[in-house]
């Protein structure tokens, strides 16, 4: 039996450190989950170097011995650790797509060309609005920072405005319906 699986919708949250990406991401994940949607996330490790391994675990020892990947499963949870020179964003998305989520949400990877929300906390963050591609919505912390900026348009919300989260959900559902 062949089943047809649509590709997941990919959406980004971009902004500098401490701009509220993780907080907005967790709210969006919870909102989509409450609608019965499956979400996978991809996070850029923006602190330089490799993310930490799970220390003192057999799987980490396997990697340290030279395995290119180690997958641990228990009661339906999988932890995958893999080593190689680098992973393109497309390869990371392909890995997550195997889990058949409705949505793949990316935190970071600012320069990628997926539809994105940009978070502006400080005046210096405004340069993101002219330097990034495919911005569909902006979240700001202080109206004074963005009030004279002509790049914002109508899809701009205060970081605490629940209408912004609703706007993203509706945008994602439109993309999902277009993807069918």
Regions found by a protein language model. Give the residues of each.
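Short coil/turn connectors at secondary-structure junctions
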Residues: 6-8, 35-37, 67, 100-101, ...
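Glycine-rich phosphate-binding loop used to anchor ATP phosphates in small-molecule kinases
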Residues: 79-120
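N-terminal phosphate/diphosphate-binding loop that engages ATP/GTP or pyrophosphate donors
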Residues: 29-84
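Short, hinge-like loop/turn segments at secondary-structure boundaries
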Residues: 56-61, 88-89, 122-124
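Walker A (P-loop) phosphate-binding motif
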Residues: 1-47
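Solvent-exposed alpha-helices and their adjacent loops that cap or buttress functional pockets
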Residues: 3-6, 63, 96-98, 128-131
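Phosphate/Mg2+-binding loops and adjacent switch elements
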Residues: 103-158, 162-178
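P-loop NTP-binding site
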Residues: 32, 95-98, 177-180
């Amino acid at each position: 039996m062949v089943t047809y699986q649509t590709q997941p919708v990919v959406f980004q949250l971009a902004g500098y450190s401490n701009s509220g990406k993780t907080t907005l991401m967790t709210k969006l994940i919870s909102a989509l989950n409450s609608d019965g949607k499956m979400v996978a996330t991809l996070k850029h490790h923006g602190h330089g170097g490799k993310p930490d391994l799970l220390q003192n675990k057999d799987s980490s020892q396997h990697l340290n011995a030279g395995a290119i990947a180690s997958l641990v499963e228990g009661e339906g949870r999988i932890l995958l650790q893999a080593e190689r020179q680098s992973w393109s964003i497309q390869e990371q998305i392909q890995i997550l797509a195997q889990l058949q989520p409705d949505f793949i949400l990316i935190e970071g990877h600012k320069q990628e060309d997926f539809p994105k929300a940009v978070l502006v906390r400080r005046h210096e963050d405004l340069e993101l609005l002219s330097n990034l591609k495919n911005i569909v919505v902006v979240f700001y912390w202080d109206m004074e920072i963005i009030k004279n900026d002509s790049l914002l348009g109508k899809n701009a919300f205060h970081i605490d405005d629940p209408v912004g989260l609703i706007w993203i959900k509706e945008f994602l559902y439109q993309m999902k319906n277009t993807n069918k």
